[in-house]
């Protein structure tokens, strides 16, 4: 079984158009999350880093601890930034990856407004800034939850299932759906390329002590020698972050 870092280092050997990143500035917001952090690690493992990578995070100290190994890298900068606010910078970002969003169930209950604004407001702020600063493409990390409730069969990309609009839990999938529509609207109206990905249940290293998603709870149970308690017979579409 390969380790996380072995997987990350292997990405550089994939046949991907890395040359398109030459002489560009790349911004990843939500850089300390599971997906954002893996993307930072992938880009910083590339042998020829002729681009500048900016890691945006709300907690500057936590980000500095996460990326301590890159602190002396000339091509790497940490930015203190909360995506719910307009961008306070004055530099060009040619590629932006929006991976900033609460994903833990406790946030859906305790801060549903924050969940919504991080997604919808975040997309709006990033595109609004990018229009004035030579943005070429924005990648929005959405979620498989946009498909709503299923019937046990695999989803198709064009599927759109129902969910309870009036539950606090709906803050997450409804925000993701609206943010996706906002992405394609900006792309059409301002001719800025956009892509959307819909990962389902991501798991991997570096989850925080506050993460109360099922996989994180299961891992804590195992480490503590406790029984794993399943609260439903449901199935999860799990994918490791390095995949």
Ranges and model annotations:
Residues 98, 124-169:
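Conserved Rossmann-fold NAD(P)-dependent oxidoreductase catalytic core, especially the SDR/UDP-sugar
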Residues 1-27, 41:
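Non-catalytic terminal and boundary segments that flank Rossmann-like NAD(P)-dependent oxidoreductase
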Residues 167-195, 223-224:
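Active-site Tyr-X1-5-Lys
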Residues 27-45:
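N-terminal Rossmann NAD(P)H-binding glycine-rich loop of SDR-like oxidoreductase domains
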Residues 239-243:
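Conserved small/polar residues in nucleotide/adenosyl-binding loops
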Residues 80-118:
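NAD(P)H-binding glycine-rich loop region in Rossmannoid oxidoreductase-like domains
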Residues 146-148, 170-171, 195-213:
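Flexible, glycine-rich beta-alpha linker
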Residues 114-125, 166, 170, 174:
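Glycine-rich NAD(P)-binding loop of the Rossmann-fold in SDR/ketoreductase-type enzymes
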